[in-house]
Amino acid sequence: ITYLSPSLEKDTSPVWSKDNNRIAYIKTPNEKNILPFEERREGLPWSIHIANSSTGEAKEIWKANEGMGSVFRSVSAKNQIFWTADDHIIFPYEKEGYTHLYSIKTTGQDEKLLTPGSFEVQFVSMSQNDIDIYFSSNQNDIDRQHIWMTNSQMANPDQLTSGLGVEWSPTADKNGNLFVLASSYNLPAHPYKVNKNGTLNSLAPKAIPKSFPKNILRKPEQIVFESSNNIKIHNQLFLPTNYDEDKNYPALIYFHGGSRRQMLLGFHHRGYYHNAFAMNQFLADQGYIVLSVNYRSGIGYGMKFREALNYGANGASEYQDVVAAGNYLRSR
């Protein structure tokens, strides 16, 4: 057994070089007095190291800045860093206040933001040629997710899917064919092949029975209201069949758990919330107005929203969004 530069810090996400002689990994400092359900906007900066697999000798090649992005923020992926065929490391980083992808050379030079903008990356995978990176994000469609592609040489990512659906978990085969899981407001998730023009072909068309009531499911409205401290809160509003704005209806407010979650304008990528979306549709079918609230401390809207001041055990500031949701419904 060869230990890679052992220390008192936490070493995670190892990935081999293409020549199998080196290993890159993330090193996160140990910090005391870190409690759950409290905002953590900065900490001791994390870093990326590369070790010689024979000797175990390692070298730090990159380190996060102090302040914004100093606390490691993960993405949904098999591994948190990717070693590409052109000898770059691609990794998630919140330097700009959003979960983005960056690249550096394995020498530690030429840090580059691959996904610029006010949005967040979530599901990430690498192509089998070890060059291209596929990912889902809410760029230009903040309450949905679509699929994009980038690599260490691109200035801006290419958008591969769009529309009123939600796409995630991209994966490519050795021939470059791209596959995803996808849903919409009236179809639950199932697998698709992504065509070159961005359209989707179902790989399991019989997975959803003909009896599924897709024609009566409602397209939720995107609602944004302002809560305390001028924080914008995104919501999905489900209205009853044949809704009449001159009539009164019973109303329900849905709050997700977590709280690191973002409810979407379609069936969700997590099983529990996939079912919760269906439940909200059912309640609307029973004559209720349903408001699903993405309260502060959730994901999708940047680090400052996720690490909301005084949230959770440090003051429950997110409860102000509960009050604001009730006031919104009362004002309709």
Where in the sequence are the language-model features?
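Hydrophobic beta-strand positions that form the internal "hydrophobic ladder"
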Residues: N20-I23, H88-I90, D132-I133, L178-F179
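Sequence/structural signature of beta-propeller blade repeats across diverse families
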Residues: N65-G69, Q109-K112, A155-D158, A207-K210
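Short loop/turn segments that connect beta-strands within beta-propeller blades
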Residues: S53-G56, K105-Q109, N151-A155, N195-G198
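A flexible loop/linker signature enriched in serine peptidases of the S9 family
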Residues: I1, S5-T12, I26-S53, E60-S76, ...
